[in-house]
Amino acid sequence: QATAEGFRVAAHNPAIIGTLSITLVANMFFFTYAPLIPVFAEKVLGVGPTLMGLLGGAHGLGAFIGAGFIALQSKINKRSGYYYKGTLVALGGLFIFSLSQVYTLSFAALVIAGMGIAGFATMQPALIILSSDDATRGRILGIVSMTIGILPLSMVLVGGMAAILGPALAIGISSGVGVALTAILSFYAREMRKL
């Protein structure tokens, strides 16, 4: 009953719908690349375990830089800007990564992607808190957790696509679709963009 009430509240709040939609897109099309890093490093970039490990940490390095930048801001007027623009930067960086066959470019692209996803990750709960009341906030945050739960299924789908098309094309298609969907959703999520 509490969950159903949370869905009812979310369905009538355009700002929450926008936030949840972009959360769904990020978990379907961005985070799914991580299990493919070893395959990408070996088959596309032709590097060994050490450079593959560094490549796997590039996203985290970028996220650390991005989160630090946000933390240093004395005042943030448009939290939604960090959220949806950060998601676009993250998916755009991942798309560049999918096209790269040069290690340094691949590493840089993932650092940029990590910087973008920091905006998504830091502002996601903030937007939910700003657009919900005390009585329903916990339920709405529960729905956020449910949307994050799409990630394992998405990983299976992208992994299957990589088995057929190769890791680069699978990541490219996934991130490209993610960029398009995020741009469309951000355009229509006017109430979310006010936050």
Label the model's feature ranges.
Residues 1-21:
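Juxtamembrane intracellular "pre-TM" segments in multi-pass secondary transporters
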Residues 4, 11, 25, 37-195:
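C-terminal transmembrane bundle of multi-pass solute transporters/carriers
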Residues 19-20, 28-40:
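Short helix-kink/termination motifs in transmembrane helices of multi-pass secondary transporters
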